Regions:
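Short amphipathic alpha-helical segments and their helix-coil junctions
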Residues: 18-23, 88, 196-207
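Alpha-helix boundary/interfacial micro-motifs
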Residues: 35, 42, 213, 222-223
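C-terminal catalytic subdomain
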Residues: 95-203, 210-217, 223
Length: 223
């Protein structure tokens, strides 16, 4: 059990039941604890490569000038003519689903201060783009968008060619489900470009521990 070493209901339960206790450092806030035993122990149990995770995080910290985590804050401040009230994070990989949930906490606890702040929204591509894109495109222009994309080309199961033979959509022949995902994310980003939306794309060539460590570290420094 991981908890602070102080008299608390959780600490008492652990002691009374002779549980293995690991101390959680009281000076590390919840949103930053992902790199402490709170986040690392579950990661080890899940079989993740922790060395690669920390290596990726260190890469960003030691090369901040290359990754430029301060650019978003600078941009939002300089756009005085636009009142951004929402920060939309759209991830195009199921592997980043829980990263998105953590990002909401990170952003809210870091940015929401003194009756000020920008609300973070996590959208999952392509699922949420079908339910939310209408609002994003034709609604109020008060949102900044971050697309986190990866390479889906030629991945996943191949579409049944016979199904589309002789139809108006026979261009699906010889394509994979990954090809469809790739087309979806590229088309959405191109639409945002054509409409002059404020957005950025963070491209991750492979969703692995090394790149996840980079993404986590980058996000913490950014906020």
């Amino acid at each position: 059990m991981i908890t602070e070493f102080k008299e608390s209901p959780l600490y008492k339960i652990a002691k009374d039941n002779n549980c293995l206790l690991l101390e959680h450092h009281k000076d590390v806030g919840g949103r930053y604890s992902i790199f402490t035993n709170v986040g690392i122990v579950p990661a080890i149990i899940s079989g993740l490569n922790i060395d690669a995770l920390f290596s990726g995080a260190s890469e960003v910290i030691n090369n901040i000038g290359n990754y430029k985590p301060y650019d978003l804050g600078r941009y939002l401040i300089q756009k005085e003519n636009v009142k951004f009230t929402n920060n939309v994070l759209m991830t195009y990989s199921d592997s980043l689903y829980f990263f998105g949930k953590w990002y909401l906490q990170l952003w809210a606890e870091s940015i929401g201060k003194n009756n000020k702040g920008i609300t973070a929204i996590h959208s999952v591509g392509t699922t949420d783009q079908h339910s939310q894109l209408q609002l994003y495109l034709d609604g109020p222009k008060d949102k900044y968008f971050t697309f986190i994309t990866t390479d889906h080309s030629n991945k996943g199961i191949k579409i049944n060619n016979d199904m589309f033979e002789g139809t108006a959509i026979d261009y699906f022949k010889d394509k994979t489900m990954g090809d469809l995902m790739e087309a979806e994310q590229r088309a959405t980003i191109e639409t945002f470009k054509l409409n002059n939306f404020s957005f950025r794309e963070i491209y991750i060539p492979k969703i692995d521990e090394q790149n996840l460590g980079k993404l986590l570290s980058f996000s913490i420094i950014e906020t």
